[in-house]
């Protein structure tokens, strides 16, 4: 019974979160994306305090996944190697890249539950979260770009920028 009540409470919170995102985007337009991004950066930095530092991108992602799970955040993601790549990790002049698949995402579920579109302010909050967390863990700037946003999963490109 407790699990059922917890699920109902979570679903109510998801609808509320979707409504806030929709209303904020309508009220202030594109600025909502920047505000949500900065909020995500702050959250990512705060939640990743005390996490061991590493220069290994896969270890940093494992650490991120671990502290998300410890805090009951439902962002299940994993590195993905496209068939035409030799390795999960790719390097170029911009930095280090890893493709990520987000199979279960509380942001996506909130948006669907409310009936709001993806790629808005809540997705930008996620980008900020990863930027803040990885800045703490790796000491480098990063970006997370949506390649595909779908009903069952999202496909994103994580770039860890080269130090200046």
Predicted stretch roles:
Residues 123, 130-133:
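Mixed-charge, glycine-accented linear interaction segment located at domain edges/termini
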Residues 1-124, 141-155, 161-164:
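N-terminal accessory segment detector
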């Amino acid at each position: 019974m407790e699990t059922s009540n917890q699920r109902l409470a979570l679903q109510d919170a998801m609808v509320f979160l979707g409504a806030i995102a929709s209303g904020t985007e309508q009220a202030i337009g594109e600025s909502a994306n920047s505000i949500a991004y900065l909020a995500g950066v702050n959250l990512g930095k705060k939640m990743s305090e005390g996490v061991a530092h590493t220069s290994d991108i896969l270890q940093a992602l494992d650490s991120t996944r671990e502290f998300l799970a410890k805090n009951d955040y439902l962002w299940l993601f994993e590195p993905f190697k496209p068939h035409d790549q030799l390795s999960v990790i790719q390097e170029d002049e911009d930095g280090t890249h890893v493709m990520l698949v987000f199979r279960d995402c509380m942001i996506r579920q909130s948006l669907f539950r409310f009936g709001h579109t993806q790629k808005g302010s809540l997705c930008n909050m996620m980008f900020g979260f990863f930027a803040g967390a990885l800045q703490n863990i790796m000491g480098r700037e990063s970006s997370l770009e949506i390649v595909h946003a779908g009903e069952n999963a999202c496909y994103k490109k994580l770039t860890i920028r080269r130090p200046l």
